[in-house]
């Protein structure tokens, strides 16, 4: 095909991303340093935040306080929460995609406090990313089991003070009953279905992670049915005063450990919102640590079909 064809072939292969490994991002198998392996031999920091201010009352958050928080938007409207794992990967709940599983229907908003940015908020729209792939755990069964999914973004995220990845670990044992765990989201704010009021800012709540024995005991009152498996855990207040609600699904539950933040759970399901003896139920990320790492390590960018057609034409050209 000649020197010119060979050059075009090399450029097309680079543009299509053929053979390029998926970015591993902010993963680790256990306690360690604050830097994690990233794509292309680079190292990336995770679990850091530069904004520490907290709005009085601990209900409404501040921009940049949770820089890994993502708003998953279905046809431009907030639908679920998520968390940034690396420049190309976002973690969320599988049940968010039960009826809407085409990547083209979704975008991911990062770095914004509000779930409804105004049309003239150019900063917000510059930090909105298209979704290339939605990878639901193959064993997902609604919201009850294996409620976890990964989104591969169509382009790389630019990090700044308001956009940073979260760390994850292969064990959550050390986080049970720790005082500094938080859940964030843009969901309803009362059991009666009160929506988030303007300016639709992210809300945060400090929660305690319960062990599964205690959680099953609470769910067995007044019935005698255990509902919490090892792939889940409960968090919140036993009196129902702190809980997640509709619209928070897929969002992160994170804990501080030695100055680094780790995502421990994904908002999954609950019995209504804010009910006594019915704490919120979360996907236990540690159970899926190796699945997450495998998907992120082995996925490759999807080539542009037009580029592949041109590539074939070059290969067959005299």
UniProtKB/Swiss-Prot annotation:
TM segment ranges: none
Residue ranges annotated for the Peptidase S1 domain, each copy included: 55-297
Keyword flag Lipoprotein: yes
A Pfam family this chain is assigned to: Trypsin
Keyword Protease among UniProt keywords: yes
One GO process term, biological-process aspect: proteolysis
GO cellular component, one term: intracellular organelle
Membrane topology note: Lipid-anchor; GPI-anchor
Propeptide positions: 20-54, 300-318
Segments forming a coiled coil: none
Gene3D superfamilies named among the record's database cross-references: Trypsin-like serine proteases
Residues annotated as catalytic: 95, 147, 249
PTM annotation, UniProt: N-glycosylated.
EC number: 3.4.21.-
InterPro entries: Peptidase_S1_PA, Peptidase_S1_PA_chymotrypsin, Peptidase_S1A, Trypsin_dom, TRYPSIN_HIS, TRYPSIN_SER
Superkingdom of origin organism: Eukaryota
Glycosylation: residue positions: 211, 284
Lipidation (GPI-anchor amidated serine): 299
Subcellular location: Cell membrane
Intrachain disulfide bonds: 80-96, 181-255, 215-234, 245-273
One term of GO molecular function: serine-type endopeptidase activity
Record keywords: Cell membrane, Disulfide bond, Glycoprotein, GPI-anchor, Hydrolase, Lipoprotein, Membrane, Protease, Serine protease, Signal
Signal sequence residues: 1-19
Family: Belongs to the peptidase S1 family.
Protein name: Serine protease 41
Gene name of this polypeptide: PRSS41
């Amino acid at each position: 095909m000649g020197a010119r064809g060979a050059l075009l072939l090399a450029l097309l292969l680079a543009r299509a991303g053929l053979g390029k490994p998926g970015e591993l991002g902010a993963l680790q198998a256990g306690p360690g340093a604050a830097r994690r392996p990233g794509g292309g031999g680079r190292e990336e920091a995770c679990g850091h935040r530069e904004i520490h201010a907290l709005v009085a009352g601990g209900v409404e958050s501040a921009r940049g306080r949770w820089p890994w928080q993502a708003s998953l938007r279905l046809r431009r409207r907030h639908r679920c929460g998520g968390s940034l794992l690396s420049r190309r990967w976002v973690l969320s709940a599988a049940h968010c995609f039960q009826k809407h599983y085409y990547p083209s229907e979704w975008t991911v908003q990062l770095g914004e406090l509000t779930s409804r940015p105004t049309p003239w908020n150019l900063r917000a729209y510059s930090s909105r990313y298209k979704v290339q792939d939605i990878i639901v755990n193959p064993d997902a069964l609604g919201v009850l089991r294996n409620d976890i999914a990964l989104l591969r973004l169509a382009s790389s995220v630019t990090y700044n003070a308001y956009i940073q990845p979260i760390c994850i670990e292969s064990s959550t044992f050390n986080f049970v009953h720790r005082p500094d765990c938080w859940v964030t989201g843009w969901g309803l704010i009362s059991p009666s279905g009160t929506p988030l009021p303007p300016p639709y800012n992210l809300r945060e709540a400090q929660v305690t992670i319960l062990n599964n024995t205690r959680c099953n005991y609470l769910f067995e009152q007044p019935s005698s049915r255990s509902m919490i498996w090892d792939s889940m855990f409960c968090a919140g207040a036993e009196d129902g005063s702190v809980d997640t609600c509709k619209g928070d699904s897929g969002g992160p539950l994170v804990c501080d450990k030695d100055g680094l933040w780790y995502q421990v759970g994904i908002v999954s399901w609950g019995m209504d919102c804010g009910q006594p003896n019915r704490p919120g139920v979360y996907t236990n990320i540690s159970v899926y640590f190796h699945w997450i790492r495998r998907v992120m390590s082995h996925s490759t960018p999807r080539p542009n079909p037009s580029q592949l057609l041109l590539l074939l034409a070059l290969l067959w050209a005299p």
